[in-house]
From Swiss-Prot:
It is found in: Cytoplasm. Residues 1-10 have a biased composition (Polar residues). Keywords: Cytoplasm, DNA-binding, Transcription, Transcription regulation. Pfam families: TACO1_YebC_N, Transcrip_reg. It comes from Fusobacterium nucleatum subsp. nucleatum (strain ATCC 25586 / DSM 15643 / BCRC 10681 / CIP 101130 / JCM 8532 / KCTC 2640 / LMG 13131 / VPI 4355). GO terms for molecular function: DNA binding. Its main location: cytoplasm. One of its GO terms (biological process) is regulation of DNA-templated transcription. One of its GO terms (cellular component) is cytosol. This is Probable transcriptional regulatory protein FN1661. Residues 1-20 are annotated as: Disordered.
Length: 249
């Protein structure tokens, strides 16, 4: 990933696959439940829940399913007791991986993570094994079409952004993770609509993958981790050039 934009391209590729296998609603539902459990069921007083609702609606999640997920988190309906977990490990060519998961059975999820890393030429590490290689940041992506670049960059910085870049038809706004919700709300109030908005783990340095076979192995691990039922987000520090990445589709 040269820069976060290429990482977004990989995530978009996975996003299309997620929709085909209908896993996206499960991810939305768990995030809604966790967000409601953490901060209550009223999105007016719970920024994380507000963002989760926006994403679920954008992904065409049925309203009744969305509302049930929130009520399970707020305690209005009986539901599974989910816990957020993080797993860290190494993949092929020394690549680092972080998996954020939501689980109702820590032992099951840990076993599945360990098995997946092992089967795909990787190793599951201890807590903190690779997280020091990443920084937790807010990332907001806005389509650049029809927007004056100078005006947007000024608006984003005034909104509290840490950095703004433009690449491949999109503006990418980076924030301190503690300022993410504030910057997002400020941009929306200024009239800008986001394409994606999330708290992400950004690698401080990347591992460049220059041959197709190694790229296949790295992406095989990435895909396998994404496919696990309890996985919510998968981050890594690999950098696969576009010309090689295109051969993997």
């Amino acid at each position: 990933m040269s820069g976060h934009s290429k990482w977004n391209n990989i995530q978009h590729r996975k996003g299309a696959q997620d929709k085909k296998r209908a896993k996206l609603f499960t991810k939305f539902g768990r995030e809604l439940t966790i967000a409601a459990k953490e901060g209550g069921g009223d999105p007016n007083f719970n920024p994380r829940l507000r963002l989760a609702i926006e994403k679920a609606k954008a992904g065409n999640m049925p309203k009744d399913i969305l509302e049930r997920a929130i009520k399970k988190g707020s305690g209005e309906l009986e539901g599974v007791d989910f816990t957020e977990m993080r797993y860290e490990g190494y993949g092929p060519a020394g690549t680092a991986f972080i998996v954020e998961a939501v689980t109702d059975n820590k032992n099951r999820t840990a076993s599945e993570m360990r098995m997946t890393f092992t089967r795909k030429d990787g190793n599951l590490g201890a807590d903190g094994a690779v997280s020091w290689m990443f920084k937790k940041k807010g990332v907001i992506t806005v389509k650049a079409e029809g927007i004056d670049a100078d005006e947007f960059m000024m608006a984003a910085l005034e909104a509290g952004a840490e950095d703004v870049t433009e690449d491949d038809g999109y503006f990418e706004v980076t924030t301190e993770y503690t300022e993410f919700q504030t910057v997002l709300e400020n941009l929306k109030n200024a009239g800008y609509q986001y394409e994606e908005a999330e708290i992400s783990m950004i690698p401080e340095n990347t591992v460049e993958i220059t041959d197709l076979e190694t790229a296949k192995k790295v992406m095989a691990l990435y895909d396998a981790l994404e496919d696990l039922d309890d996985s919510q987000n998968v981050y890594s520090n690999f950098d696969i050039p576009d010309e090689i990445l295109e051969q993997l589709d």
